[in-house]
């Protein structure tokens, strides 16, 4: 199995967690190329006028992963608690992508106001990834530790 990760939006914040998580489960990862004019042009073919350039680039990254992986990771962060809602265009991106493109997506939604934590959302992937919930939970916790170590090292 191969998971595609678009190199956009929250990628640079979460990449260490995601890469460690999938590596610990023995799952191959393919990351889209760095953003170029072509990436944005590809994304513009599937976007509307109200979408910001970041979302257009993100769509381009997803398009570039078509045919290179079994599933594309499409995170959705609705909020981190009260008064922290993200952009409505961003929140709807998962649905736009899955309706416009022929891809299989792995999605998770963080919404602390709805008690949807990252860990709970990762556990939902067990059937897709063909791993037990115990394996998912262990890989998630170890990946969180890995990501924290990397962030600490970068801060020093």
Regions found by a protein language model. Name each.
Residues 1-156:
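An N-terminal assembly and electron-transfer interface module characteristic of large anaerobic redox
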């Amino acid at each position: 199995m191969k998971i595609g990760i678009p190199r956009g939006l929250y990628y640079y914040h979460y990449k260490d967690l995601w890469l460690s998580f999938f590596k610990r489960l023995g799952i191959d990862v393919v990351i889209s190329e760095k953003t170029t004019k072509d990436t944005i042009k590809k994304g513009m073919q599937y976007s509307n006028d109200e979408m910001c350039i970041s979302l257009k680039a993100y769509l381009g990254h997803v398009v570039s992963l078509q045919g290179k992986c079994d599933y594309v990771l499409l995170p959705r962060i609705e909020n981190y608690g009260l008064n922290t809602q993200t952009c409505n265009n961003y929140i709807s991106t998962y649905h736009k992508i899955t309706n416009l493109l022929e891809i299989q997506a792995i999605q998770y939604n963080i919404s602390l106001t709805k008690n949807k934590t990252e860990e709970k959302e990762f556990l939902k992937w067990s059937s897709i990834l063909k791993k037990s919930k115990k394996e998912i939970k262990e890989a998630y916790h170890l990946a969180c530790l890995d990501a924290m170590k990397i962030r600490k090292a970068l801060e020093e």
